[in-house]
Amino acid sequence: MDVKCKDIHYSIGEKKILNGVSLKVEGGQFQTILGPNGSGKSTLLKTIYRQLKPDSGHILLDGKSLDQVSLKETAKEMAVVTQFNTLQFDCTVEEIVMLARTPHLSFLQKESERDHLLVQDALDKVGMSEKKTRYYSSLSGGEKQRVILARALAQEPKLLLLDEPTNHLDIKYQLEMLALVKELGINVLAVLHDIQLACRFSDYIYLMKGGEIVAQGVPRDAVTPQSLQAVYDVQSRITWTDDQQAMIQYL
């Protein structure tokens, strides 16, 4: 599922949160939005997955206006992983991941063998199979995050939105999660905090400040001493490795 945002504006009262943001994710790319807190990154994602309605502008999914795409169709093809995953009810790990199959089932239809296989495969990929009978409330923050990623994988999405998904994870699982997502080969739009992780895994990067995109491009073009100065107000020196890893020294 391709997504295109065109001139998105969003305000809370007199405060402008998004000011004419435009971007597109297509071709199975992993794209990342970077920027300081309050720059509008998460707000932009929320307009795409319909938690917030923009004041103006257009959001297109596969060329169709967001208003013309049903919630059920969106739920089949778009998955979301956020940094805060509090549930109002307690279920086992396996039950939570199985919820991903709900949009693919008709009313009162039972889960098929394929549904169960997809859930098991997703749990295997995030290393949570041995805890599938545990209750979600008993898990650590990092384990909960891996369960939510498994749920997204079991959904078989064509578009994956990630809002700071690695915040609660140890570095080992941060690397594993982003590598796993990258290998899916689907459209991904992620908000990340770690600039070096973003450079390593992203095909394209946007840098936001004050509700606007101020720099964009492939990692080497987007992440420069000049753009980091403009966005984060820091001086830096950047060295790039052959495998697209950015070694950033702050001065």
Which residue ranges define each predicted feature?
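Conserved structural motif at the start of ABC-family nucleotide-binding domains
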Residues: 3-5, 17-20
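Conserved ABC ATPase signature
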Residues: 110, 135-139, 143
